[in-house]
């Protein structure tokens, strides 16, 4: 049996494969008429799709609107949001974007289909509060870099290849480290806290290892991985993500783990000092740990919806 990520991901991939129209590259820098290349490039390079926006991971529409606002404040035009708050007509324009941003693991298959179909590059990361600047910078770099690589193509071959990838599970879920924004700068801390609370210098920034993390968070790899990155950068604390979901390959940072089953999770949490997780995890957490509630609708449903997402 698969979890929700698998089913929702395949559903969005099917939409990307069949409802985004024929593959037609337009507005390319290399094809623009003389004098209009810069205008065409600038206009296209700021267009973006958000992939994997579902209430199961992000919560109500207001949470998605907040994410979109953060990106718009950095000058991005959100063409479509897959799939909260937008129509099928809006999703059908996805091929016009310069870059796609996967905001949860659900969006990875659609991102790969759109890449195969239109050549659109994608990055993985959630613009949680305090992280939107880094997200925008990463998007800017890849949008600028890919602009000159696009070539006009007005036949059906790209559309067909988009359909072909739908039948290849490994290709649908493929993610490379370079595409994951919250991997970047992970080892940038020059000093960390040891269990005594004192700061110590690390001998090699590429060998950051913590036997006991300062903070343990539980949840979906992209949203919580992005949150972990913000906490580490802002507070200099080591954060470990424990993910109870099925699809994590290529999405977990060094030191993060996939945990299957309640017993395994309870065992892993025995040494946790600060825990951020859905409230339903509290009964299996040690009483000595500080527990911060962060509801995950895919786990606890609507039990805490009104308490934490009043609208």
What do these predicted ranges mean?
Residues 1-311:
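An N-terminal assembly and electron-transfer interface module characteristic of large anaerobic redox
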């Amino acid at each position: 049996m698969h979890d929700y990520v698998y089913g929702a991901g395949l559903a969005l991939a099917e939409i990307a494969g069949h409802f985004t129209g024929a593959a037609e590259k337009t507005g390319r820098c290399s094809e623009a008429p003389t004098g209009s290349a810069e205008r065409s490039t600038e206009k296209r390079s700021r267009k973006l799709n958000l992939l994997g926006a579902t209430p199961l991971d992000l919560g109500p529409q207001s949470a998605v609107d907040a994410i979109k606002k953060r990106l718009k404040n950095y000058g991005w035009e959100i063409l479509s949001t897959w799939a909260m708050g937008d129509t099928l007509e809006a999703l059908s324009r996805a091929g016009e974007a310069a870059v796609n941003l996967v905001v949860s693991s659900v969006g990875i298959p659609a991102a790969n289909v759109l890449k195969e179909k239109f050549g659109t590059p994608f990055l993985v990361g959630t613009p949680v509060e305090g992280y939107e600047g880094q997200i925008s910078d990463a998007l800017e770099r890849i949008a600028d870099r890919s602009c000159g690589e696009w070539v006009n193509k007005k036949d059906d071959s790209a559309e067909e290849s988009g359909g072909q990838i739908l039948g290849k599970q490994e290709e649908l879920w493929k993610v490379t480290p370079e595409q994951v924004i919250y991997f970047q700068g992970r080892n940038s801390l020059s000093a960390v806290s040891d269990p005594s609370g004192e700061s110590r210098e690390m001998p090699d920034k590429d060998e950051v290892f913590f036997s006991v993390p300062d903070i343990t968070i539980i949840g979906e790899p992209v949203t919580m991985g992005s949150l972990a990155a913000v906490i580490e950068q802002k507070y200099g604390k080591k954060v470990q993500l424990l993910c109870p979901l099925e699809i994590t390959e290529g999405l977990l940072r060094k030191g993060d783990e996939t945990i299957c089953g309640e017993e395994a999770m309870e065992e892993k949490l025995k040494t946790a000092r600060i825990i951020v997780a859905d409230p339903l995890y509290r009964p299996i957490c040690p009483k000595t740990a500080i527990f911060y509630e962060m509801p995950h609708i895919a786990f606890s449903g609507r039990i805490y919806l009104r308490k934490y997402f009043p609208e």
